[in-house]
């Protein structure tokens, strides 16, 4: 425990905030170019083939970014928009690709949470014609 005189001389050291998405440089999103698009497997209790892209950002940093949703049109040299947000079961993946922005297409046939996946609003007539995946009448 410091004395009052020691506190007058030195003061308390402020805790430094450490960013969870340092490659964004305090920006909400960043543009980048895909250098590699691949699938990888998650950590121990989970099992899947997660879609991931290696992206070179405009600030010349390289990051791994998750491609959310079912199916995607990304390949090498695609221009993508990156936002922060990690994937808990993929070590080293701290960013998400924004669907429906730049070269990334939205998710086809998405009815719910459309804004998160860049899906357009379905036309009123089409809603009844195409039943959702996995649903039975």
UniProtKB/Swiss-Prot annotation:
The modification 3-methylthioaspartic acid is found at residue 89. One of its GO terms (cellular component) is small ribosomal subunit. The keyword Lipid metabolism does not apply. GO terms for biological process: translation. Pfam families: Ribosom_S12_S23. Residues 124-137 have a biased composition (Low complexity). InterPro entries: NA-bd_OB-fold, Ribosomal_uS12, Ribosomal_uS12_bac. Keywords: Methylation, Ribonucleoprotein, Ribosomal protein, RNA-binding, rRNA-binding, tRNA-binding. Residues 104-137 are annotated as: Disordered. The keyword rRNA-binding applies. It comes from the Bacteria. Residues 111-123 have a biased composition (Basic residues). GO terms for molecular function: rRNA binding; structural constituent of ribosome; tRNA binding. Part of the 30S ribosomal subunit. Contacts proteins S8 and S17. May interact with IF1 in the 30S initiation complex. Belongs to the universal ribosomal protein uS12 family. With S4 and S5 plays an important role in translational accuracy. This is Small ribosomal subunit protein uS12.
